[in-house]
Amino acid sequence: VLLAEDNAANQHLARRLLEKRGHAVTVVANGREAIDAVRCRRFDVVLMDVQMPEVDGYEATAAIRAGETPGGRRLPIIALTAHAISGDRQRCLQAGMDDYLSKPIRKEDLYDMIERWGAAPADPQTDHGPDPQTHATEPGDALQLAAVDLARLKGLAGDDPDLIGEVAEIFLAESEDLMQAIRDSLAEGDAETLSKAAHSLKGSVANFGAEQAFEAARSVEMASRHNELDGLDAVVQTLAEQVDTVRHDLERLLMAKEFSE
């Protein structure tokens, strides 16, 4: 499986879920790298994020299709998108993609999609779900979390405490840099960089079901995409406060028993 995704947390989550299922995974961070990877080796399926730097998923798909031999094998390409917008699926299909998977990605949806398109796992029984003893205690459930939806996070990660912890740690490591990029690009009037940073942050907080942080990030992304930066300072401040709340929730989760060895 070729995974083309620029968000570090989403990369890690999808790769680990696929590897648990028995799939070999190659990860690239933009469309140009995806095109090069397909030219160099054969893949069963491509998972293609539609919004990536340098070359986006639509452009990469068009280039891959242009390189295919007429009448020859058609490489299945599955779009990954955070856009829950009517007509988005049709745009993906028109671009030459074969199917569509909405982010944040759920384990069952991911497995069903790639195996429907021909990427058979090395061992279909590899992922049996969590060991029953992991449900003996649920200290994470006892925590009163202000922003993070633990049930959604467990659903995304297949109820795997290790994977939940890894995704949380990635967010804690990258979210401060993303917020700083958002502040700096707003101060400099750099709408393009602002939009990209807000988009990346939006994709990360979606994994945790942090709706207020997600909406704030989406507002910043949409405004900057249309170069409407006036009045964004207050929205960015709200976003920073919501991200801090998510970070606090995740730090508490990492300290809870079910996320420790």
Q: How would you label these PLM feature ranges?
A:
Residues 1-143, 247-251, 261:
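C-terminal compact regulatory domains
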Residues 99, 106-261:
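Two-component system phosphorelay core
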